[in-house]
C-alpha cells in the first residue's frame, strides 16, 4: 500500500506551523485571549503546549535530555515558534537516520498528565505530529469564533505537499 510518508506529514505540519507563526506575528493580541482548550488558560498556553509536546517527543526520539515543561512558560511567541522549527528538524533528523529496528523499538517515559507510557518510536513520531494538528484545529475554530479568522486554508488538500 502506498500512502503518505512521514516526511510528507512532517512537511505538512511544518508548513502549517509556519503559517501560524506568520499569522500570530500579524495578530499578536490573539495570543492573550482566554480559552479552555486542553485545560489551558489562554491561547499562548495552547501554543506552548503544542510546541512543548512536539519538542519533548523529538528529544526522546533522539535520546536528548528532556526539556522541562516549566522552563518554556516564559517564552515569547517568536521563541516558541523557533523551538517548533527546531523540533521539526529534530524529528526529521530522527526519521532520516532511523532504521526499521529504531522505528519498532519502544520507549517508556513519564508524561505530565497520563502517568508512564510505553510506545514504539513510530507511534511517538506520529503522535508528536498529529497532536499538533488536533490542537491547531481546535485553536483555529476558537480563534474564528472570537473574530480572528486565519488567512489560509488549513486542509491538507490545499497544502503544497504532494500533488
PLM features per residue range, with description:
Residues 1-2, 8:
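N-terminal beta-strand motif that seeds the catalytic metal site of vicinal oxygen chelate
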Residues 7-24, 29-72, 112-163:
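Short, contiguous alpha-helical
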Residues 63-103:
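Helix-adjacent hinge/juxtasegments
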Residues 91-127:
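A mid-sequence interfacial segment
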Amino acid at each position: 500500500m502506498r500512502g503518505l510518508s512521514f516526511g510528507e506529514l512532517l512537511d505538512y505540519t511544518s508548513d502549517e506551523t509556519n503559517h501560524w507563526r506568520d499569522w500570530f506575528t500579524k495578530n499578536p493580541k490573539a495570543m492573550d485571549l482566554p480559552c479552555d482548550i486542553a485545560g489551558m488558560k489562554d491561547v499562548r498556553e495552547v501554543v506552548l503546549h503544542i510546541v512543548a509536546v512536539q519538542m519533548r517527543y523529538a528529544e526522546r526520539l533522539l535520546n536528548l535530555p528532556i526539556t522541562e515543561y516549566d522552563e518554556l512558560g516564559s517564552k515569547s511567541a517568536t521563541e516558541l515558534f523557533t523551538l517548533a522549527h527546531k523540533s521539526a528538524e529534530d524529528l526529521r533528523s530522527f526519521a532520516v537516520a532511523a532504521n526499521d529496528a529504531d522505528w519498532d523499538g519502544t520507549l517508556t517515559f513519564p508524561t505530565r498528565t497520563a502517568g508512564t507510557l510505553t510506545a514504539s518510536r513510530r507511534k511517538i513520531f506520529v503522535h508528536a505530529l498529529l497532536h499538533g494538528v488536533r490542537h491547531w484545529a481546535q485553536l483555529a475554530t476558537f480563534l474564528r469564533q472570537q473574530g480572528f479568522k486565519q488567512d489560509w486554508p488549513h486542509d491538507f488538500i490545499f497544502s503544497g505537499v504532494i500533488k
